[in-house]
A protein has these predicted regions:
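Long, internal low-complexity/basic segments
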Residues: 54, 135-196
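Conserved hydrophobic "DFG−1" position in protein kinase catalytic cores
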Residues: 7, 33, 79, 105-106, ...
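Polar, surface-exposed loop/tail segments
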Residues: 38-104, 141-150, 164-169
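C-terminal, low-complexity/hydrophilic appendages and adjacent surface loops
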Residues: 21-29, 95-137, 174-196
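Proline-centered helix-kink/hinge sites
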Residues: 30, 36, 55-56, 129
Length: 196
């Protein structure tokens, strides 16, 4: 998984901070795969893919595409693994299932929205790959923020399950110690255990 090692003053995963962060160092995950005779060795790909793409990819690689459940996000990246071209993906939507933080990322832009209170972020990744200059709130980017937020919210309206949607979850920086929605455990994850 992604792990910040001091970038932005953060040590650990994105869901272990308050507010939760969506810096690339916390959310980007290297993906390595080997299947001699099926996938060419030493292939490097810089296309944007998501964990949602793993299921359709594995099903296609194994000849089981017809077993793909309907209504799920994600698309196969088998062509990329084989060094072939495929239609370019414009965006990847990321969410933090342990709290109300969502992000949409294109090759050029990243928009982070924290429900309900902010701090929201907008980064121009071409000019600012280290995500140091937050452009959110600048008037010249208002239309872009509206477009990115709309695309992100449309994705969640299509694919999220309201019963476990983290957008309404409390945020406390405890990472995976808390569960979203109907699976939430409302206890202090930092309280000493077995002490009266």
């Amino acid at each position: 998984n992604g792990m910040s090692m001091g970038q932005h003053g953060v040590w650990g995963k994105g869901n272990g901070t308050f507010p939760m962060n969506m810096y690339d160092s916390a959310v980007k995950v290297p993906f390595l795969i080997s299947w001699p005779g099926h996938i060419p060795a030493n292939t490097v790909c810089s296309e944007m893919i998501s964990a949602c793409d793993l299921l359709p990819t594995i099903l296609k690689l194994t000849g089981l595409s017809d077993k793909q459940p309907t209504g799920l996000p994600g698309r196969s990246f088998t062509e990329l693994l084989k060094g072939e071209q495929r239609e370019h993906r414009d965006e990847v939507v990321i969410f933090d299932e342990y709290g109300p933080v969502r992000m949409i990322r294109t090759k050029e832009w990243k928009y982070v929205h924290r429900y309900p209170y902010g701090k929201h972020e907008l980064y121009h990744l071409v000019d600012d790959p280290g995500e140091e200059k937050n452009l959110y709130g600048l008037p010249e980017y208002k239309k872009l923020v509206t477009q990115l937020k709309g695309r992100m919210e449309k994705w969640f309206c299509t694919y999220s399950d309201p019963a476990i949607d983290g957008v309404r979850s409390a945020v406390n920086g405890s990472g995976q110690l808390c569960r979203p929605g109907v699976y939430a455990i409302y206890e202090d994850p930092f309280a000493p255990k077995g002490v009266e």
